[in-house]
């Protein structure tokens, strides 16, 4: 917080050095004058913040009291904890399974831990943990351990085999299935906090929880992840007010057993695909959480957010260099989002809900609107030589400081690096989004080398790469020209003048 205080003092000092005309409300250069796009973006952010506070401070506490009042009757008769592990270090695996098994014992109902793994070493470790915990905590008559061995062909296969293993147990109608990543550590009491909502709300098909992280890597990565999870908490809480979260995070989400054992659901998670107008049909490699989310969304069921239940994820950035690691992660995250985006929009606002549906539409719009500010300033500067560029960067510093303070509604601390990381996420993240949007078929895991072969010959593969680059350049050019015409930084030649030239 000391760093943030120094940032605020520097901001105030620079403000005193700015020309007085920039602070004059009657001046056309008044710093607080917002364009239409800027007002929309900031208004949209404030709306999410307000909805988040309403959900966490007013709506959710009422839900919590109602769930607590149900007592033991609110818990399902059987809980399945499906944990997928592949190429996770031994210490993280130990923490993850220890937390999962202890929660299975602690929840007080019949529980089955299903470990979907590749290496035999993991199986031996998990068995030792299980027997040690059951001997120490008791509950051996209620808690079982099962293994699903797969060939390292990817997380989608691991989940599909795990869901089929759940089906073989013939779970009762009120059972729940929790899907946990191999790097996600459950907080004590998570199951008893969250599972009662299936009983309280019969129309809820799934839920997800809050996340924090332990980052193995450079301090800048730690700050970036912490900031993203704070933003996630606000956005998820806002969407929780509508009963339609925008993703069922793969780190920890829970489903009704009747959904998780539905053959169509399992097939969707195992082999999902889209038909693209230019790229043709291609399967999804990553984004299993988006596939499961879309299935529940299509069924018209609610998906809620449980803000007081938490998992701790162990994060290993794919590169020690911040820029490279962030780029690799953004390509995967944004690709997962955009590949499912169009078909979710196609469901329509009546099925999805008006506010969630518009949020999904906004996922596409925001990659362009977020670039409008820096692009507009650059165009004006190039065409007029105006010192507006200095005003713009001060405005960025000021507004990102304000945005950083709003994150205190989600977390106890913020960092002086957040204003810079927020702007990095906005501008560079939008650049990456536009890149991915025109190359939806490019997919890659950051932890494994699993790939999907599309069966294209060399000529067609090169043609698709070339057309992807072409439409990307065309889209960016249209954006710049359209914005330039709107700002009158670019002028269309007079038609009469062109006729005379001919």
Each model region followed by its residue ranges:
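Membrane-embedded multi-pass helical conduit in multi-pass membrane proteins
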Residues: 12-42, 362-444, 479-502
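Juxtamembrane amphipathic/hinge helix adjacent to a transmembrane helix
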Residues: 343-347, 444-460
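Loop-to-transmembrane boundary segments
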Residues: 1-5, 82-84, 89-93, 352-369, ...
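Non-transmembrane catalytic domains and loops of membrane-associated enzymes and transporters
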Residues: 63-352
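Short hydrophobic helices that act as membrane-entry/anchoring signals
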Residues: 3, 44, 48, 222-229, ...
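N-proximal low-complexity "stem/linker" segments adjacent to membrane-targeting elements
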Residues: 1-99
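Hydrophobic alpha-helical transmembrane segments and immediately flanking/interface helices
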Residues: 100-117, 310, 314-316, 452-473, ...
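Perimembrane helix-loop junctions in membrane proteins
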Residues: 48-63, 266-268, 407-410, 436, ...
């Amino acid at each position: 917080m000391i760093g943030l205080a120094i940032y605020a003092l520097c901001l105030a000092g620079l403000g005193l050095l700015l020309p007085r005309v920039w602070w004059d409300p009657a001046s056309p250069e008044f710093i607080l004058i917002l364009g239409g796009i800027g007002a929309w973006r900031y208004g949209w952010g404030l709306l999410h913040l307000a909805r988040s506070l309403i959900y966490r401070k007013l709506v959710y506490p009422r839900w919590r009291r109602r769930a607590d009042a149900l007592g033991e009757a609110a818990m399902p008769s059987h809980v399945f904890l499906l944990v997928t592990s592949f190429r996770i270090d031994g210490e993280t695996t130990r923490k993850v399974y220890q937390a999962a098994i202890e929660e299975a014992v602690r929840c007080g109902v019949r529980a089955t831990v299903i470990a979907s793994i590749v290496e035999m070493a993991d199986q031996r470790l998990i068995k030792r943990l299980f027997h040690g915990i059951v001997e120490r905590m008791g509950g051996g008559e209620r808690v079982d351990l099962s293994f699903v061995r797969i060939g390292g062909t990817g997380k989608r296969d691991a989940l599909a085999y795990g869901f089929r293993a759940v089906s073989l147990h013939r779970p009762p109608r009120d059972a729940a299935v929790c899907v946990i990543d191999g790097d996600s550590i459950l907080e004590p009491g998570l199951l008893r906090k969250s599972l009662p909502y299936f009983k309280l709300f019969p129309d809820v098909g799934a839920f997800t929880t809050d996340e924090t992280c332990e980052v193995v890597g450079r301090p800048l990565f730690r700050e970036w992840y912490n900031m993203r999870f704070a933003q996630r908490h606000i956005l998820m809480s806002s969407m929780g007010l509508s009963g339609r979260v925008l993703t069922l995070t793969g780190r920890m989400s829970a489903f009704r057993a009747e959904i998780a054992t539905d053959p169509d659901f399992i097939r969707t998670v195992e082999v999902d695909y889209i038909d693209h107008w230019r790229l043709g049909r291609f399967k999804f490699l990553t984004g299993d959480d988006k596939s499961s989310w879309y299935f529940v969304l299509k069924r018209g069921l609610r998906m809620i957010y449980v803000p007081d239940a938490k998992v701790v994820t162990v994060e290993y950035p794919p590169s020690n260099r911040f820029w490279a690691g962030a780029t690799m992660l953004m390509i995967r995250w944004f690709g997962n989002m955009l590949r499912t985006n169009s078909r979710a929009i196609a469901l329509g606002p009546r099925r999805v809900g008006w506010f969630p549906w518009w949020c999904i539409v906004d996922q596409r719009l925001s990659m362009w609107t977020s670039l409008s500010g820096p692009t507009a300033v650059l165009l004006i500067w190039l065409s007029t030589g105006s010192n507006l560029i200095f005003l713009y960067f001060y405005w960025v510093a000021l507004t990102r400081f304000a945005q950083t303070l709003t994150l205190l509604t989600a977390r106890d601390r913020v960092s002086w690096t957040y204003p810079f990381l927020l702007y990095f996420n906005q501008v560079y993240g939008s650049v990456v989004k536009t890149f991915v949007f025109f190359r939806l078929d490019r997919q890659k895991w950051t932890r494994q080398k699993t790939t999907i072969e599309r069966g294209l010959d060399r000529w067609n593969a090169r043609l698709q790469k070339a057309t992807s680059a072409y439409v990307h350049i065309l889209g960016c050019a249209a954006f710049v020209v359209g914005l330039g015409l709107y700002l009158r930084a670019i002028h269309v030649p007079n038609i009469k003048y062109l006729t005379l030239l001919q």
